[in-house]
Design a protein with these regions (language model features):
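Active-site-proximal beta-alpha loop/turn segments in soluble metabolic enzymes
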Residues: 182-191, 226-233
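Sec-dependent signal peptide recognition
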Residues: 2-8
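Hydrophobic h-region of N-terminal signal peptides that target proteins for export
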Residues: 10-18
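Short, electropositive, low-hydrophobicity segments enriched in small/polar residues
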Residues: 42, 117, 190, 219, ...
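Outer membrane beta-barrel
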Residues: 23-186, 194-200, 205-214, 286-290, ...
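Basic/polar N-terminal segments that are highly enriched at the extreme N-terminus
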Residues: 5, 18-27
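Alpha-helical transmembrane segments and their juxtamembrane interfaces
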Residues: 12-13, 82, 121, 273
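Outer-membrane beta-barrel pore domains
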Residues: 48-52, 71, 88, 99-103, ...
Length: 359
């Protein structure tokens, strides 16, 4: 009996000591700063285009993210896109963001990894904050969403390294000037550089008053891709490095729940189909006004893209809509668009309804 009591006592003491040790186990400090978040965008669209009627529910985006800081000076983020299929890289679940940024100095920050290209005001915006049923056509076609070069859908992202910063503070502590410039593979997300030639993308904007910024952006580079061209002997296909030279002019005013933004983007360089020529451009202008501040908004957007920089190749959306925030992280959006496609001599109506949530 004494032996049994002794064994039981020793076992209890061992368990108590083990529990005490566990209480003193400390996680690395950077783990305490890790934030888990995500969002989803459920979309319904219907259009009455002649001989191509559509109406469908879809998951526009579903994403999960981890982000945090290491030693205060370093910020990092990993973001996954979950919606899609497993049949192709373009549409399968995939990594969209994976980067770290050294942020010790406000006027000089260094970012490396996979992230949004520093081109235009709209491209880096969160898709819910951006305000409409999709990014504008010129941003989609000329910043790497459904790019005219045939680049895989990359949501405006690439792999590379960039520097950026803000400086020239006024008396209130607000910076007057922002700059950013980076070097990238030029192939979009999750891709190596296929021609060993890098893209250089940069931008700068001034902020002369609170809420207002006016900027300009430039982009030069190449993409190694398959092209087709119609010749006297018939269609010719080959793989080659195709030049991309692009610029954007941008202006935005965002203050007290009001937003007005306009951008013009120009591109020189052949599309995947060379018959479309080597020039394209597009522009958009939008306004978002509060009906109930931080609760309900009405909005309008004029969105035009010319695939060959001619009016005959233009596609234009005339959009109006509204959104209502059911809570801070849940909102409903309704939009109507009249669409004019000059290339196909067609005009039609489009209705979009979305439920967006964050956590």
């Amino acid at each position: 009996m004494k032996k049994i009591m002794m064994i039981a006592l020793m076992t209890a003491m061992t368990l108590a000591a083990s529990a005490q040790e566990k209480k003193h186990i400390e996680l690395p400090a950077w783990l305490n700063n890790v934030k888990f978040s995500g969002y989803g965008m459920v979309q319904y669209q219907a259009l009455d285009k002649e001989n191509a009627h559509e109406n469908s529910f879809q998951l526009r985006l579903v994403r999960l993210a981890l982000e945090g800081r290491i030693q205060q000076d370093w910020y990092w983020k990993l973001q996954l896109q979950l919606n899609g299929n497993t049949s192709s890289l373009n549409a399968s679940p995939r990594i969209v963001d994976a980067f770290a940024e050294w942020q010790k100095y406000e006027f000089f920050k260094v970012k490396a990894g996979q992230y949004k290209r520093p081109f235009t005001f709209e491209n880096p915006m969160h898709p819910i904050t951006q305000g409409f049923m999709s990014y504008s056509q010129p941003v989609s076609k000329l910043a790497g969403f459904s790019d005219r070069t045939g680049e895989q859908s990359s949501n405006g992202r690439d792999i590379g390294v960039q520097i950026q910063g803000d400086f020239l503070k006024d008396n209130s502590g607000r910076n007057w000037l922002h700059y950013q410039v980076g070097v990238f593979n030029g192939e979009g997300i999750n891709q190596k550089d296929k021609d060993n030639k890098k893209d250089i993308i940069g931008g700068m904007w001034v902020m002369p008053m609170k809420g207002l910024r006016i900027g300009a952006f430039g982009w030069t580079g190449t993409r190694y891709m398959a092209t087709t061209e119609t010749t006297e002997q018939g269609p010719v296909s080959k793989t080659e490095s195709v030049r991309k030279n692009r610029y954007a002019l941008s202006a935005e005013y965002a203050l007290n729940d009001w937003t007005a933004r306009a951008e013009y983007i120009h591109s020189q360089g052949f599309a995947a189909n060379k018959d479309k020529g080597d020039k394209a451009d597009g522009w958009y202008a939008l306004a978002i006004a509060p009906v109930i501040k931080n609760k309900m908004h009405v909005k309008a957007r004029y969105d035009c893209y010319r695939d060959q920089k001619t009016w005959a190749s233009s596609k234009t959306y005339y959009e109006v809509g509204a959104d209502y925030l059911l809570s801070k992280n849940l909102q409903v959006n309704l939009e109507y668009a009249r669409v004019n496609e000059r290339a196909t001599h067609s005009s039609y109506n489009l209705v979009d309804v979305e439920l967006d949530f964050r956590f």
